[in-house]
UniProtKB/Swiss-Prot annotation:
Active site: 109 (proton acceptor)
Originating organism: Citrifermentans bemidjiense (strain ATCC BAA-1014 / DSM 16622 / JCM 12645 / Bem)
Record-listed E.C. numbers: 2.7.1.33
Name of the protein this chain belongs to: Type III pantothenate kinase
Gene it is expressed from: coaX
Subunit note: Homodimer.
Length: 254
């Protein structure tokens, strides 16, 4: 079995693959204060509930945008699984040309998404990933990564409103009953939610205009299923896109 690990700023997503089939997946909060042993215990408990033991895992691949945790999970892989993991970054074969001023600046998760998307759809793509930051990535018809845009994520936007406006409460991210809200909580939700839908559609439409390839628009990430139904540009939600990309990169490097 293959263990794929996607480390984001807010969540760590784990997946277990048996060949090309995703057997189990988990989403846990990212905690930079946790030690190797604490993560080892967490993984052990998750695996035990799924009737999986560490020795079932024959290889590991990691994508991380949190450098401090990259090292922790590399050491965990060696200590608990007796495996030297693949880590997405310099030296890893992706099979995708990256047209960026400095390719090393592109987040590993963005490249992983691009690879998975193009492998699945084989056409020009815009990939919208709703994470701590929301990223927009353009892949052309040749399967080349062309760049993209980064915006504050929904949670960051809502938290900023609470932190910077003294009288506004902290509220959950949700679709309100109406854009013309009747109370403060719904008013904040309306501004963030519908404003964010407009942000997504606006950026996607501008990318389409610049790219001139009529790209397919797919969304992934924790809040994709919340925003996608209101968007006029998102065509499909693929919640496991990043995990699938890690599996593909592993296959290209083993």
């Amino acid at each position: 079995m293959l263990l794929v690990i996607d480390v984001g700023n807010s969540n760590i997503v784990l997946g277990i693959y048996d060949e090309e089939r995703l057997v189990r997946d988990w989403r846990v909060s990212t905690d930079k204060s946790k030690t190797i042993d604490e993560y080892g215990i967490l993984f052990h408990d998750l695996f035990r509930l799924a009737d999986i033991v560490f020795t079932d895992v024959k290889d590991i691949i990691i994508s991380s945008v949190v450098p401090t945790l990259t090292g922790v999970l590399e050491k965990l892989s060696r200590q608990y699984f007796k495996i030297s993991p693949y880590v997405v970054g310099p030296g890893i074969k992706t099979g995708m040309p990256i047209h960026y001023d400095n390719p090393k600046e592109v987040g590993a998760d963005r490249i992983v998404n691009a690879i998975a998307g193009f492998e699945k759809y084989r056409t020009a793509l815009i990939i919208v990933d709703f994470g701590t930051a929301t990223t927009f990535d353009y892949v052309n018809k040749k399967g080349e990564y062309c760049g993209g845009a980064i915006a504050p994520g929904l949670a960051i936007s809502m938290e900023a409103l609470f932190m910077k406006a003294s009288k506004l409460p902290r509220v959950d991210i949700a679709r309100p009953p109406s854009i013309i809200a009747k109370n403060t909580v719904n008013s904040m939700q309306a501004g963030i939610f519908f404003g964010y839908v407009g942000l997504v559609d606006g950026i996607v439409q501008r990318m389409k205009g610049e790219g001139k390839e009529n790209p397919k628009v797919i969304a992934t990430g924790g809040l994709a299923s919340l925003i996608a139904p209101e968007s006029v540009t998102i065509e499909e939600v693929d919640e496991f896109l990043t995990l699938e990309g890690l599996r593909i990169i592993y296959q290209r490097n083993k």
